[in-house]
Amino acid sequence: MSFKMTQNQYTSLYGPTVGDSIRLGDTNLFAQIEKDYAVYGEEATFGGGKSIRDGMAQNPRVTRDDVNVADLVISNAVIIDYDKVVKADIGIKNGYIFAIGNAGNPDIMDNVDIIIGSTTDIIAAEGKIVTAGGIDTHVHFINPEQAEVALESGITTHIGGGTGASEGSKATTVTPGPWHIHRMLEAAEGLPINVGFTGKGQATNPTALIEQINAGAIGLKVHEDWGATPSALSHALDVADEFDVQIALHADTLNEAGFMEDTMAAVKDRVLHMYHTEGAGGGHAPDLIKSAAFSNILPSSTNPTLPYTHNTVDEHLDMVMITHHLNAAIPEDIAFADSRIRKETIAAEDVLQDMGVFSMISSDSQAMGRVGEVITRTWQVAHRMKEQRGPLDGDFEHNDNNRIKRYIAKYTINPAITHGISEYVGSIEPGKLADIVLWDPIFFGVKPELVVKGGLINSAVNGDANGSIPTSEPMKYRKMYGQYGGNLTSTSMTFVSKTAYENGINRALNLKRMVRPVKNIRQLSKADMKNNSATPKLDVDPQTYEVYVDGEKITSNAATELPLTQRYFLF
């Protein structure tokens, strides 16, 4: 005999199901469940009187040797990813996702993809949202504490360069030369996130570039503070093509060695990652933004200009002066800073993100950007654009799935593809490292509930260790066992070039972390950017700095109020 319950009763027990919508934080965005993998009436839930007990949803006879027996099941989660908004159980084994589907005991339950046995732990995600760990591809490695701050925001991978609080690191995402690269690879052993380092891309002698790739750099950064000349860029791209690594470009703001057209002529048709493509973070003034129309350019934004608010322009001048070691007593330095801050191109940036013309969002950590705000600012932009531009095509009331998939791709799968690590991270898919972020919908985009790193809980909101229950105040982020002992190295990856990997860089430096090679980079094009591959004609008026897409002027209004702000940071 079947049992009937109301939709509210079902949701309170098992979370939302097909057709239900979840509001993301206090934004105007709603995610609607497209598919539910559960068999109604056979949902696996943990707790007193619940179904995950011996002989019920937990199989009493299987052992861990069975490939379908999970080490960890995240039950009844709403998965938001670049290609799906679904309700499912997630099976994790040996630190990797092995299945997305229905968990339980196949002896008594139908359509079981993931077996729960006596060796299985449970994270109850009923009513919660799960996303892939975020990837920040514009990190200045200035301060190792950035890793913890980012982790507590939902970011699990950092890509960039630096050696600490040097002037070179403060201004440029560069880890220069084999000695520094090796020291940073060793330092990464103590970080609770995945990392990859970019070397310095300025040299006419290819040997000076190749030795950095051989040392383990996953790519090269060409930055104007070291000289972003067409010659330097072309030489760096030659080496990148040979070794299948990425080039990240911070182009020539002052147009000293050439204009945007000269840079693109040096690039030819070769792929590169264009940093802060709007230009406030640096790059050809005033028209770097036009590069996003090229099919070989993978464009990203950094978060200080996102979203456009009434404070954005005012705060940027001082940031530029400090970050790039400029002197306020020198008129030319002031002019340099002023040339980068253009409210018209900043106002267009949000719209280009919403149209899928810009493909990624990153931080520019401590070098104008905020390492813990990539995810928050991404969703603030999505909110603002829905507010100003209305629903995207295919979206409707209480269903913003197309916009949600577009925006989540900007800090998950697209950065992973761009830097050749999408085989390992960037989405909730079988075969990938279990870097997973769990959110209470109320706090989505601001404060995760916990972070699973390589299959083990790495960081979580938890109470006083002397409390009688785990929610005793003060509730705050605390390091979990994933950050202790050998787990620090067994749950995170260090990414290196293929040549360094094949030559045994892990053995040469006695690295304990999982070392993996980047791959499949040089054949990329913008068409590979998920949900963010638009290449319209872009123009910038050289006098007014107004931006045009296919001949139509685009802009946005400066926000005076945003979601995901003060109400979440009272304590």
From Swiss-Prot:
GO cellular component: cytoplasm
Domain Urease as annotated: residue spans: 133-571
Binding positions for Ni(2+) 2 per the UniProt entry: K221, H250, H276
Swiss-Prot/TrEMBL cofactor(s): Ni cation
Any Gene Ontology biological process: urea catabolic process
Stored SUPFAM superfamilies: Composite domain of metallo-dependent hydrolases, Metallo-dependent hydrolases
Subcellular location: Cytoplasm
Protein family membership: Belongs to the metallo-dependent hydrolases superfamily. Urease alpha subunit family.
Protein name: Urease subunit alpha
